[in-house]
């Protein structure tokens, strides 16, 4: 049983006790008044009966006296009749229906209790409905908040993707422009080298003559390898130092392979540019020869 029901029961018991005491006092006062009224009515009836008897006796006495006066002495010898006095019974006052105040109080208390119970049930039903509505409202709010969070995350991801695409596009454009600039620079450099290629060969021959004996390609390779290759001294190294040395050697090999690949690509590009320039030179020479022949024929004419 909850605290509210206990308080309600205590209040109802107090109200019942007070109403029972008040009704009992009222009932006693009504009984006292009713008894007093009955006694007064009974006393009044007796007085009225006595008065009627007295008046009747006086009337009878008066009649007898009148008769005696009329009849004279002859009638004096006759016995006087005894007057008949009927027993006058006072009217009986009906008691009426007796009111059961306990039953009325009990019914009233039952009615109040039923009304209070219905009010309590209605209150709890309304409270339950309000709690259910509050829970559903909280669920809707959480759902909307989760949907808004998902939309925000999607918008952020889409924005990041657009930014990455823009950066990638800008980087590609920059690389393309840089590659074109490098190609143009290499072409110009190759063209200048082709123009000075003959002088370079002559200078190289002169330097070789001055140095004396000409080195072969194999000797050049051995010399370069001897300069690059270092003595590997690992006898005095521990495990960690050996691991670091291995990482260093691996990095050097990686760098050499990268340089080799770059040199190969550079050699291919230079070879391609040389072929292109050579073809251009041949085309220019053919055009210049045809123009010179035309001028000569024209001059002889």
From Swiss-Prot:
Domain of life: Eukaryota
Modified residues (Phosphothreonine): 207, 216, 297
Region called Disordered, residue ranges: 1-99, 125-223
Post-translational modification: Phosphorylation at Thr-216 by PRKCA induces significant reduction in myofilament calcium sensitivity and actomyosin ATPase activity.
Acidic residues biased stretches: 1-42, 50-74
Pfam families membership: Troponin (PF00992)
Tissue specificity: The major isoform in adult heart is CTNT4.
Keywords: Acetylation, Muscle protein, Phosphoprotein
InterPro entries according to UniProt: TNNT, Troponin, Troponin_sf
One GO cellular component term noted in the UniProt record for this chain: striated muscle thin filament
Record PTM N-acetylserine, positions in chain: 2
Sequence ranges of Pro residues compositional bias: 82-93
GO molecular function: actin binding; tropomyosin binding; troponin C binding; troponin I binding
GO biological process: cardiac muscle contraction; muscle filament sliding; negative regulation of ATP-dependent activity; positive regulation of ATP-dependent activity; regulation of heart contraction; regulation of muscle contraction; response to calcium ion; sarcomere organization
Comp. bias regions, Basic and acidic residues: 125-186, 206-223
Phosphoserine modified-residue sites: 2, 211
Record's subunit section: Binds with troponins I and C to make the thin-filament regulatory complex, troponin.
Role according to the record: Troponin T is the tropomyosin-binding subunit of troponin, the thin filament regulatory complex which confers calcium-sensitivity to striated muscle actomyosin ATPase activity.
Family note: Belongs to the troponin T family.
Protein name: Troponin T, cardiac muscle
Organism encoding this protein: Oryctolagus cuniculus (Rabbit)
Taxonomic lineage of the native organism: Eukaryota, Metazoa, Chordata, Craniata, Vertebrata
């Amino acid at each position: 049983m909850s605290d509210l029901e206990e308080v309600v029961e205590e209040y109802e018991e107090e109200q019942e006790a007070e109403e029972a005491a008040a009704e009992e006092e009222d009932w006693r006062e009504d009984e006292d008044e009713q008894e007093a009224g009955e006694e007064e009515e009974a006393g009044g009836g007796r007085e009225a009966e006595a008065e009627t008897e007295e008046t009747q006796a006086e009337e009878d006495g008066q009649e007898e006296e009148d008769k005696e006066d009329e009849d004279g002495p002859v009638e004096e010898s006759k016995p006087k009749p005894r007057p008949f006095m009927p027993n006058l019974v006072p009217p009986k006052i009906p008691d009426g229906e007796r009111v059961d105040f306990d039953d009325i109080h009990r019914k009233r208390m039952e009615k109040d209790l039923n009304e209070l119970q219905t009010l309590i049930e209605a209150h709890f039903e309304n409270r339950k409905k309000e709690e259910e509505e509050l829970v559903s409202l909280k669920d809707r709010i959480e759902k909307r908040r989760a949907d808004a969070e998902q939309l925000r995350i999607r918008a952020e991801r889409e924005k990041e993707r657009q930014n990455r695409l823009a950066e990638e596009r800008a980087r590609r454009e920059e690389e393309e422009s840089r590659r074109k600039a490098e190609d143009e620079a290499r072409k110009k450099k190759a063209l200048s080298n082709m123009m000075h290629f003959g002088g370079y060969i002559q200078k190289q021959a002169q330097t070789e003559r001055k140095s004396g004996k000409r080195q072969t390609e194999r000797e050049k390779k051995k010399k370069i390898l001897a300069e690059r290759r270092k003595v590997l001294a690992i006898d005095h190294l521990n495990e960690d130092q050996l691991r670091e040395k291995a990482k260093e050697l691996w990095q050097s090999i990686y760098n050499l392979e990268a340089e080799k690949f770059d040199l190969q690509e550079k050699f291919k590009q230079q070879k391609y540019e040389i072929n292109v320039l050579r073809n251009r030179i041949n085309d220019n020479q053919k055009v210049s020869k045809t123009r010179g022949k035309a001028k000569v024929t024209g001059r002889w004419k």
